[in-house]
């Protein structure tokens, strides 16, 4: 592309949602980006608001990470390729950009990369802007029939896929999912696909328990501090084979997860507590001989996620309860912060 044409394209305006500080989002004008070698320009289609986005918006940090300000949030997204022979192709976008060279990448764990860049985190701008450039290697073309909204939710589905792989759910197992937000509901769907015979789900919000049943939970319980006792009673004192904690509520769900697990069980912690700390009874975990694993984002999940949705084995559409345009960003973030519905989507 000629330098002058590049200059003209870069001068074309776009809207970009900049996060400056707690409760301070501003929709501003910006220049469209120009792709570097190995990258391609994308026109953003749909962006899901994640729990970590809300932690940033309400508290200024998440998972012990603070941001460089201003920053564009948004890491659950789909987009249309905006240049080249594939212009107009809808793609899912992996927000994680590992280095590919470090010890952990070489071991097959790019989610643990020491040099990882992640959309909408640290100093890497995310997708809440009309255009962005991204490495071609992180794009996954979506088949006909896929909606942009579904494409955006392949990222949280990937988190659920990774978590259930860590848990190693087998047919006939009894599983618990503590926290029935989007990640919890997708974990329920994945546990059901893996053949779990009984799935207990908990949440503090009654409406989310209804969604848990719709997504495959056989038993739903309010997260009132007594759920562990009820689960033990329902399983004749045996407890759960595999437990997934997806609430991120600073300890209560983690403690209940530990107390609900059978001897020798695996407990997978997915949720991110707002205070970056959690507690549970060490003696309860030790007496049970539990294996406790932390789920760090996801790895190698996009092809599987696309296949599962394409085959109708995973339902993403039912999780989308609110949709907004970019100009109504304030309402979108406030709705998500109030935990109304399940998944809030911003369509660009």
Describe these PLM feature segments.
Residues 167, 210, 215-291:
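Glycine-rich cofactor phosphate-binding loops and adjacent beta1-alpha1 units
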Residues 91, 175, 241-243:
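Receiver (REC) domain switch-region micro-motif
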Residues 99-178:
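NAD(P)H dinucleotide-binding glycine-rich loop of Rossmann-like/cofactor-binding domains
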Residues 205, 273, 298:
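Residues in the short beta-alpha loop(s) of Rossmann-like NAD(P)-binding domains
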Residues 88, 144-225:
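Mid-domain Rossmann-like dinucleotide-binding core that forms the NAD(H)/NADP(H) cofactor-binding site
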């Amino acid at each position: 592309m000629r330098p002058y044409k590049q200059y003209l394209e870069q001068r074309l305006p776009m809207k970009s949602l900049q996060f400056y500080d707690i409760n301070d989002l501003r929709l501003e004008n910006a220049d469209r980006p120009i792709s570097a070698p190995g990258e391609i320009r994308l026109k953003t289609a749909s962006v899901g608001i994640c729990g970590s986005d809300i932690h940033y918006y309400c508290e200024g940090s998440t998972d012990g990470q603070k941001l460089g300000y201003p920053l564009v949030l948004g890491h659950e997204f789909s987009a249309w390729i905006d240049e080249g022979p594939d212009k107009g192709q809808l793609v899912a976008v992996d927000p994680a950009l590992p280095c590919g060279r470090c010890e952990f990448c070489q071991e097959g764990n790019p989610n643990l990369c020491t040099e990882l860049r992640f959309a909408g985190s640290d100093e890497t701008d995310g997708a809440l802007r009309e255009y962005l450039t991204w490495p071609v290697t992180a794009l996954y073309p979506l088949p006909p029939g896929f909606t942009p909204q579904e494409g955006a939710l392949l990222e949280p589905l990937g988190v659920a896929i990774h978590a259930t792989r860590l848990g190693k759910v087998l047919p006939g197992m009894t599983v618990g999912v503590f926290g029935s937000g989007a990640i919890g509901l997708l974990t329920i769907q994945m546990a059901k696909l893996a053949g779990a015979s009984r799935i207990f789900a908990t949440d503090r919000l009654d409406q989310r328990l209804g969604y848990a049943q719709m997504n495959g939970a056989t038993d739903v319980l309010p997260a009132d501090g007594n759920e562990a006792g009820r689960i033990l009673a329902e399983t004749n004192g045996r407890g759960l084979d595999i437990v997934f904690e997806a609430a991120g509520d600073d300890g209560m769900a983690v403690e209940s997860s530990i107390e609900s697990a059978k001897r020798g069980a695996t407990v997978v912690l997915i949720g991110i507590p707002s205070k970056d700390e959690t507690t549970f009874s060490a003696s309860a975990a030790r007496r049970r001989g539990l294996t406790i694993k932390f789920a760090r984002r996801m790895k190698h999940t996009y092809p599987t996620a696309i296949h599962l949705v394409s085959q109708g084995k995973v339902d993403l559409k039912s999780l989308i309860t609110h949709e907004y345009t970019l100009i109504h960003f304030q309402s979108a973030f406030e709705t998500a912060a109030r935990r109304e519905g399940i998944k809030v989507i911003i369509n660009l």
